Amino acid sequence: MYYDKIISCIVSATENVIPHRKICGNEHNVTGWADYVEEKHDIARQAFLQWCHDGKPRLGPGYLHMYRSRAAFKQALRFCKRNKERLQADALALSYNNVDAKKFWKGVTTAANRKATANVNKISGAVGEQNICNMWCNHFRQLYNSVHTDSDKCAFYDTAANIDKQSPVRVTVADVRDAIAALKNTKAPGPNGVHTEAFKYAGFRLWTHLSLFYTFCLCHSYVPDNFMSINIVPLVKNKCGDLTDVNNYRAIALCNIDTKVLEKIVLAEVTTYHACDDHQFGFKKNHSTTLCTAAVKQTIDYYARRGSHVFVCFIDYSKAFDKVNYWKIFGQLLDDSVNSYIVLLLAYWYSHQQASVIWMNTRSSAFTVGNGTKQGGILSPYLFSRYIRLLLYKISVSKIGCHIGGMAANVFAYADDVVLLAPSWHGMQDLIAILTGCCKCLDLECNVRKTKCMVVNPISVDKTVRRTFPCFSINGQMIEFVTEFKYLGHILSAKMQDDCDITREIRNMYARTNMLVQRFRKCSLKVKLAIFKAYFMCFYGISLWWSFNVSTMLKFKYCYNKCVKKFFGYKKYDSATAVFMELKLPTANTVLHNHRSLFKACWKNHSNSIVSLIRDVYRPTPLS
């Protein structure tokens, strides 16, 4: 009752303060409406209403005024539609000159991602908006109740009944204020329809009521039903893929803003009890996919320089986030002496949450969520890291596989992307056996079809080795061997050459240039320079290009010069050096040097224990 009154007050205050203007027709789709069309549209509308009031005469001054005002309105509308690109370019230039960075980059992103997408009327045999929504509801109901958790639930409550309860956590007004301030604006609201801005600008009185409400929830390990409701929105993974395939969608959970505030407060409390494993590079500050890939490549290079083969296994999980058994996570939290009031609150919260699917303008019936972590939730990254910690720990302490300076470098993970490293076939098979046992314990399922293995030795690649050693298997299914694999966006090859990844970036650069030229060819030079620095100087994985053929790098530099000249409207036979000097832009060599220098500084000063060990023990590295 108390919670419902708080939310109803926020909703009523929002409706009274924020005006809701209904958009009619295609008004919001016309670029330049406010500057060129709106005034003439109002005049034409008033003239039309006056003409109707006069009885719709076919002659006279009233008819002429209506006719001419409508003609002026239609002419302005045609002008905006015919000059849409120029008007968009002028709007970008105006926001750039006014130093309105948020509006400028919002316009750039909108124009860059503009793509005609047809409405999907059929998915997995379901036709029609309502039938598709019901299909999604049945699909997610089955997915989020696919793990048997009864035994783990009983074990958790038995453990919770036998521990000594600590003092309950008190939520202060400062905690609520800091949690609300940390939330991002312009995010989609939850089921109650309240936006983040309503909480940020409500003031001290609302924060006081929320602190009391959150304290009551923690003391009694209870939250209202409306507090736990979530909306599930299926989003497309690959827009160029099959839009009628269920597996081409991922579920994003939208919860209430007040729920996110409590998640922020709980996250700040539980993180003080646990430090994440250094083998996990995901969901951690100052860690990135580039750092994880660099650690993998350095470990392989450490063994390759000593003439040893390295077996690499890239593990792919099937619905890892959606099949998390959260009762095991709560049991781990109790074992780590996390405040029992927080753990019991999370247990009640996750075991009673209700979800509904939103598809276009249709909402499905609610269903109970029995397993899985919410993709998009604030607590979800922390809970998944705790869940997969057991797997990483057992592999790292097994003393099997690659080691550097006495520390295990046999497993690296970025979220659910796990890679195993071993210098021998027996070692890799033992690591796979340990991983399979941990997956059974954690109710995780390996996708053998997408799991790949690769044998690496850039010094002496012996083809007979691949023919003589047996294949690896998971649950009786053979794992395919490959010579190239795209791990975290970077292509790793059996010869540890980066030519394939450079070729990938060349293709991406050509495609990106064609898109930008089409979208922004009528923009001013200042706008083009800003867009160039954002889209042409941030190459993913460029700091990991350590070994490559000279001809491949020359192709990359030629592609870079060609794209610069095309984007800024120069002739293809113009001198690239003169273009760079005139526009004061960095050359390809400068971009490469800057990226390598920044990553080298990050590598040398990083606090991760594995990165520090590789840096200190293994001196002759490409980053030295």
Please annotate each region the language model reported.
Residues M1-G125, N561-K562:
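Arg/Lys-enriched, amphipathic patches
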Residues Y317-A415, L420-D430, R449:
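Conserved polymerase palm-domain catalytic core
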Residues T186-V194, I232, T244-L254, L291-G331:
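Conserved catalytic palm subdomain of right-hand nucleotidyl-transferase polymerases, strongest
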Residues I7, V11, W207, T244-D278, ...:
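Conserved pre-motif C helix in the palm subdomain of viral-like polymerases
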Residues G190, S229-I232, R250, Q280, ...:
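Catalytic palm active-site di-aspartate
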